[in-house]
Amino acid sequence: MTKQFNSNGRILFEGKSNIDNKDIVVIITGLDNKTSNKKTGDMLQTWILLRDHAPNTSHKNGLNKSVCGSCPHMGNRQNSCYVKWFQAPLQVWKSYKNNRYDYFKKSDLNLIKGRSLRLGSAGDPTVIDLKVWKPLLDVCKNHTGYTHQWRSNFAQQYKGIVQASCDSFQDYLLASGLGFKCFYVKHKDTKIDKKLFINCPASIEMGQKTECSICSLCSGSKRDIVINAHGSTAKYVALEV
């Protein structure tokens, strides 16, 4: 009997994490079905997960370091991570463990053409080598991506590809000094020099003028972006003076 794969996703990568050499997997989804995230719009999603550990429990007990690295929101630190690890990441991982996804083939690049791509819907895109993403980046319409690993040597190849995730103005100064374009998440009352940044056009404070799939400013090579912390995790972002 022929195995029935879930055609909405593919296994993009199986191998070792750049962070600690642990086994990880990267799954791409949205190949059949459009996504409905209000902020991002219709984008292909990529899930960077531990191969053999459920993502929700891995997040709670700190095992997610293999895919999240030094992200300050990794682990059970006040639950400040915006990713709902018990929702889509867990479902994707379960499908993977149940052998529901086929491997990504060269011919599947036709499914990427003209689509918007989100590098790291969960997990940090720099934990795998850029050469894995490159074929997709070469054919997609546009992409977004963010990394908290911008201090790490392995992440330097991603300059011009992803934004450095910055949790303070000091982070911004350091990351931009290394050559990264930045995505700075700040307390709503933290004052900034408006000449340095563009406010995220998809943010609540900017009236959600567009979607990430249309905007594509967060592609690592355009501008430094700032956004007010929002949602249930905003209370964990400190006011800077």
Please report, for each region that a protein language model flagged, where it lies by residue.
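Class I S-adenosyl-L-methionine
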Residues: 1-241
